[in-house]
Regions:
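Short, charged, surface-exposed secondary-structure boundary motifs
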Residues: 122-128, 184-192, 202-207
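Short, Lys/Arg-enriched, disordered terminal segments
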Residues: 1-2, 204-210
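Alpha-helical substrate-recognition element adjacent to the catalytic core
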Residues: 2-116
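Acidic, Mg2+-coordinating phosphoryl-transfer loop and its flanking beta/alpha structural elements
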Residues: 93-94, 153-195
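Substrate-recognition "cap/lid" segment bordering the active-site pocket of phosphatases
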Residues: 101-155
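Short, acidic/turn-prone active-site loops that include or flank metal/cofactor-
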Residues: 114-121, 179-183, 196-200
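Well-ordered alpha-helical segments embedded in enzymatic catalytic cores
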Residues: 73-76, 141-144, 199
Length: 210
């Protein structure tokens, strides 16, 4: 059985989408992310209300997504994990299928290997609510694998924000990728803080996680 690599999308493999929306739409409050706010559900209620107040439907956001590319070398990093290090890559993201669709193609990731959320859209095309893939946190996905007796020895997890902490706790090797000062300051000492994909690859090689 391949080892598992549980990886976040925004801030790790792709840019922070809401920061892009904030800049293009000129709504500074949309730039707030889980690097600053730990309570994701409260953050999403705040974002949805902002979009409604500014009359921004989902199709507007989807159009803006087309302007964004995955992070440089992200695809090559994933291919290296899969082909050279023999990891099975699983995406665990608090983003939404409706926004991530173009990136699955860019990164050569099967959508079946992703655990994301969905938007609930009203008849006028505006985001009304969130249909959550899980209730408590990203760790729930890993716990499900544990319950199914899937071998997770030497598995890794990569995230960048507070909402990634719970999944990083459950693997042998947890990486914080380019964390903010606030996230870094409040993270457990045993999380590995890295600034590049190459640092992760080097760590896996040096520690023979292959």
């Amino acid at each position: 059985m391949k080892k598992m690599a549980f990886i976040d999308m925004e801030g790790v493999l792709i840019p922070e989408l809401w920061k892009h929306f904030s800049t293009v739409l000129n709504i500074p409050e949309l730039a707030i992310t889980t690097r600053e706010v730990a309570d994701y559900k409260s953050l999403m209620k705040f974002r949805i209300n902002l979009l409604k107040e500014n009359n921004i439907p989902l199709k507007k956001l989807v159009g803006l997504i087309k302007e964004i590319d995955a992070s440089p070398n992200a695809k090559e990093f994933l291919e290296h994990l899969k082909n050279n290090k023999k990891f099975e890559v699983k995406i665990i993201s608090d983003c939404f299928y409706e926004l991530l669709d173009p990136f699955f193609d860019q990164l050569n990731l099967p959508i079946d290997n992703a655990y994301c959320h969905n938007f609930e859209i009203n008849s006028n095309g505006y985001i009304e609510n969130v249909i959550y893939n899980r209730n408590k946190g990203k760790h729930e996905i890993i716990v499900d694998y544990q319950k199914k007796k899937v071998p997770l020895k030497n598995s890794i997890a990569i995230g960048d924000a507070f909402n990634d902490f719970t999944m990083l706790h459950l693997v042998d090797h947890g990486f914080l990728f380019q964390p903010s000062e606030e996230v870094s300051k409040n993270s457990p000492f045993y999380f590995h803080k890295v600034e590049s994909y190459q640092e992760i690859i080097q760590y896996l090689t040096n520690n023979r996680v292959a």
